[in-house]
Amino acid sequence: MAGGTLYTYPDNWRAYKPLIAAQYSRFPIKVASSPPEFQFGLTNKTPEFLKKFPLGKVPAFEGNNGFCLFESSAIAHYVANDELRGSNNRLHQAQVIQWVGFSDSHVVPPASAWVFPTLGIMQFNKQATEQAKEEIKTVLGVLDCHLQTRTFLVGERITLADITLTCSLLWLYKQVLEPSFRQPYGNVTRWFVTCVNQPEFRAVLGEVKLCDKMAQFDAKKFAEVQPKKETPKKEKPAKEPKKKKKKKKKATPAPAPAPEDDLDESEKALAAEPKSKDPYAHLPKSSFIMDEFKRKYSNEDTLTVALPYFWEHFEKEGWSIWYAEYKFPEELTQTFMSCNLITGMFQRLDKLRKTAFASVILFGTNNNSTISGVWVFRGHDLAFTLSEDWQIDYESYTWRKLESDSEECRTMVKEYFAWEGEFKHVGKAFNQGKIFK
């Protein structure tokens, strides 16, 4: 085996994947995670590093013979042995890829949204956290059902599927999955504990203790962490004004390059896009401030604060409320897959967020579900028809404008925004919801 070097920062859960895989395959791998070999935030921004790894992200792997790999799952696949990849069984190989993709798409995003605020890495958002909890419940439910008659995810031995999902669930189990939360998912916890106690896992992770009490957002910890990130930006302009107090004209352009330097490639690409025409430019200014309502909805109680605010400030002359129902319920199978339809639509409609709000709900169970939602748009036309940027997935739904003063509209807004109520028009129980804001 040629071996190679893995660049990362200490305790990077993504780096655990290739490191555990290397324990099983006996692949010789050197870890560079501290000076002078590697310092995160400095080394990964140098021209030499970016030439090898253009995104500047870690973990990143450089083989002893000079080739380079990025993305933790790809690195783990490379350093693994055939058994971890699914042996010579094509079905097992496909199933390993399936669970690795499942981990990246369905576990990591909600896990990050829930756990990061408890670590002081991210600001707390009540609505995002509650939504993440519901998504994690769905994920754990899928895994629990699959593991009911299985020791491991694929076949009879540990594979990259087990390694990847264990690493993705690691911080959940360490920070927030307290006993009462994880109790309904006993098969998952049994499997997780089995994995982390394997010698190859313990060599990388050490002893893993499951949390006793769900960690909460710590404002003090967040305040301590955040200034460290901002320090480089503050130091540059602080020095320049002292030298250029009398030169007012030259002082203003000096800091200009800094924001551009801070943009990653995707942000630069977005900044370079031509500006689209505003479909609502012809409408008079509205007194209803959508962003303010979204703040209320995200951070305050829905029934006692957000909804009263909505109806107090909603301007029916400049805004409209629509009911949408998915046209093809007979095609909906697994509930987590149905939720992907909603999430995918939301992601592709990012340019509509500024002037819209929606609560879309999945009702029912596996192979017997429906999707419907309530949307709020600027103006009185169906928003999707007004811009090419917005013409995404909306034709898969039937749309009906609601009369904002009607009892039907008031009831629907209350039930869909609060995710609770009788939902008499649906005839199925609430499963889970998604918010577009």
From Swiss-Prot:
<feature type="compositionally biased region" description="Basic and acidic residues">
    <location>
        <begin position="266"/>
        <end position="279"/>
    </location>
</feature>
<feature type="domain" description="GST N-terminal">
    <location>
        <begin position="2"/>
        <end position="87"/>
    </location>
</feature>
<dbReference type="InterPro" id="IPR004046">
    <property type="entry name" value="GST_C"/>
</dbReference>
<feature type="domain" description="GST C-terminal">
    <location>
        <begin position="89"/>
        <end position="222"/>
    </location>
</feature>
<dbReference type="InterPro" id="IPR004045">
    <property type="entry name" value="Glutathione_S-Trfase_N"/>
</dbReference>
<protein>
    <recommendedName>
        <fullName>Elongation factor 1-gamma-B</fullName>
    </recommendedName>
</protein>
<dbReference type="InterPro" id="IPR036433">
    <property type="entry name" value="EF1B_G_C_sf"/>
</dbReference>
<dbReference type="InterPro" id="IPR001662">
    <property type="entry name" value="EF1B_G_C"/>
</dbReference>
<keyword id="KW-0648">Protein biosynthesis</keyword>
<dbReference type="InterPro" id="IPR010987">
    <property type="entry name" value="Glutathione-S-Trfase_C-like"/>
</dbReference>
<feature type="region of interest" description="Disordered">
    <location>
        <begin position="225"/>
        <end position="279"/>
    </location>
</feature>
<comment type="function">
    <text>Probably plays a role in anchoring the complex to other cellular components.</text>
</comment>
<dbReference type="GO" id="GO:0005634">
    <property type="term" value="C:nucleus"/>
</dbReference>
<dbReference type="Pfam" id="PF00043">
    <property type="entry name" value="GST_C"/>
</dbReference>
<dbReference type="Pfam" id="PF00647">
    <property type="entry name" value="EF1G"/>
</dbReference>
<feature type="compositionally biased region" description="Basic and acidic residues">
    <location>
        <begin position="225"/>
        <end position="240"/>
    </location>
</feature>
<dbReference type="GO" id="GO:0006414">
    <property type="term" value="P:translational elongation"/>
</dbReference>
<dbReference type="InterPro" id="IPR040079">
    <property type="entry name" value="Glutathione_S-Trfase"/>
</dbReference>
<dbReference type="InterPro" id="IPR036249">
    <property type="entry name" value="Thioredoxin-like_sf"/>
</dbReference>
<keyword id="KW-0251">Elongation factor</keyword>
<dbReference type="GO" id="GO:0005737">
    <property type="term" value="C:cytoplasm"/>
</dbReference>
<feature type="compositionally biased region" description="Basic residues">
    <location>
        <begin position="241"/>
        <end position="251"/>
    </location>
</feature>
<dbReference type="GO" id="GO:0003746">
    <property type="term" value="F:translation elongation factor activity"/>
</dbReference>
<dbReference type="Pfam" id="PF02798">
    <property type="entry name" value="GST_N"/>
</dbReference>
<dbReference type="InterPro" id="IPR050802">
    <property type="entry name" value="EF-GSTs"/>
</dbReference>
<feature type="domain" description="EF-1-gamma C-terminal">
    <location>
        <begin position="276"/>
        <end position="437"/>
    </location>
</feature>
<comment type="subunit">
    <text>EF-1 is composed of four subunits: alpha, beta, delta, and gamma.</text>
</comment>
<dbReference type="InterPro" id="IPR036282">
    <property type="entry name" value="Glutathione-S-Trfase_C_sf"/>
</dbReference>
